[in-house]
Amino acid sequence: MLVLGLETSCDETGVALYDSERGLLADALFSQIDLHRVFGGVVPELASRDHVKRMLPLIRQVLDEAGCVATEIDAIAYTAGPGLVGALLVGASCAQALAFAWDIPAIGVHHMEGHLLAPMLEENPPQFPFVALLVSGGHTQLVRVDGIGQYELLGESLDDAAGEAFDKTAKLIGLNYPGGPEIARLAERGVPGRFVFPRPMTDRPGLAFSFSGLKTFALNTWQQCRDAGDDNEQTRCDVSLAFQQAVVETLTIKCKRALKQTGLKRLVIAGGVSANKALRASLEDMLGSIKGNVYYARPQFCTDNGAMIAYAGCQRLLAGQQQDLAISVQARWPMEQLPPL
């Protein structure tokens, strides 16, 4: 089965072709970072308009790259949520229009299920069951995964997601959008131990997260340095390092708890923050200490992309899941509501 995947949940237009027998044939991505940077964050209306502009050229690009023609496509998968409604509607309407024109099925895919399954595109994919850490700009969740659609939420953030905290903290200390990569870059030049930030909610049992207080702690630290005339580039690097260390250690502690609670020794990390090198290194060390394994996608498939949507949609289509031509998207969509395969 050859599936065209379309991703438009936020500020990246992703298109890919995935074949159930040959694997990923082509993928293309257009990032809107430059468009939104001047505003310090994503502007939903601008995001939607740019998706409209980029979608068809990217579809042509992946067809050319794969050496395929439209008549060879068996189905279309598109992101149906969660995400920005206007942006989601661009991908959904394009998918359903093409599906109607080509007389093929279209299926809406859960954005975070796409992220969760992205490591399946790698040479050494994880085997079920496993614990997944979904960590992005909109989500920080620990999930037990027994199969596709078989998800048990173990814990999640009570306020800001980890990726959101990265971006907001970066903005507070004067870094450009997107803030996560900027903090990671500056943290490499930070002096360890100059600042020590708290590890929120690690002093109590449970698997819930909270990052809003950590963001406030970073702001107060930066303001104190600024009041003392010490708001220079090195201080910015030191604050970035302290913040990143706090987030990484918090996530690592909670992952270790989740693995102990479930009795599993396989961990998948997925979502944009999973590209963070410090997080990967910390989780690899932790899994090594308990003789477990950690899995993640290549960096280009950690952030939003069409390949993960094509793959996830293909699995559900192969299992016989169908959908009518109604255009339906959801800004919020708990992953536990998905039907199991």
Swiss-Prot record:
<dbReference type="InterPro" id="IPR022450">
    <property type="entry name" value="TsaD"/>
</dbReference>
<keyword id="KW-0819">tRNA processing</keyword>
<dbReference type="GO" id="GO:0005737">
    <property type="term" value="C:cytoplasm"/>
</dbReference>
<keyword id="KW-0479">Metal-binding</keyword>
<keyword id="KW-0808">Transferase</keyword>
<dbReference type="InterPro" id="IPR017861">
    <property type="entry name" value="KAE1/TsaD"/>
</dbReference>
<feature type="binding site">
    <location>
        <position position="276"/>
    </location>
    <ligand>
        <name>substrate</name>
    </ligand>
</feature>
<feature type="binding site">
    <location>
        <position position="304"/>
    </location>
    <ligand>
        <name>Fe cation</name>
    </ligand>
</feature>
<dbReference type="GO" id="GO:0061711">
    <property type="term" value="F:N(6)-L-threonylcarbamoyladenine synthase activity"/>
</dbReference>
<keyword id="KW-0963">Cytoplasm</keyword>
<feature type="binding site">
    <location>
        <position position="111"/>
    </location>
    <ligand>
        <name>Fe cation</name>
    </ligand>
</feature>
<feature type="binding site">
    <location>
        <position position="115"/>
    </location>
    <ligand>
        <name>Fe cation</name>
    </ligand>
</feature>
<feature type="binding site">
    <location>
        <position position="167"/>
    </location>
    <ligand>
        <name>substrate</name>
    </ligand>
</feature>
<keyword id="KW-0408">Iron</keyword>
<dbReference type="GO" id="GO:0002949">
    <property type="term" value="P:tRNA threonylcarbamoyladenosine modification"/>
</dbReference>
<protein>
    <recommendedName>
        <fullName>tRNA N6-adenosine threonylcarbamoyltransferase</fullName>
        <ecNumber>2.3.1.234</ecNumber>
    </recommendedName>
</protein>
<dbReference type="GO" id="GO:0005506">
    <property type="term" value="F:iron ion binding"/>
</dbReference>
<dbReference type="Pfam" id="PF00814">
    <property type="entry name" value="TsaD"/>
</dbReference>
<comment type="similarity">
    <text>Belongs to the KAE1 / TsaD family.</text>
</comment>
<comment type="function">
    <text>Required for the formation of a threonylcarbamoyl group on adenosine at position 37 (t(6)A37) in tRNAs that read codons beginning with adenine. Is involved in the transfer of the threonylcarbamoyl moiety of threonylcarbamoyl-AMP (TC-AMP) to the N6 group of A37, together with TsaE and TsaB. TsaD likely plays a direct catalytic role in this reaction.</text>
</comment>
<keyword id="KW-0012">Acyltransferase</keyword>
<feature type="binding site">
    <location>
        <position position="180"/>
    </location>
    <ligand>
        <name>substrate</name>
    </ligand>
</feature>
<dbReference type="InterPro" id="IPR043129">
    <property type="entry name" value="ATPase_NBD"/>
</dbReference>
<dbReference type="InterPro" id="IPR000905">
    <property type="entry name" value="Gcp-like_dom"/>
</dbReference>
<feature type="binding site">
    <location>
        <begin position="134"/>
        <end position="138"/>
    </location>
    <ligand>
        <name>substrate</name>
    </ligand>
</feature>
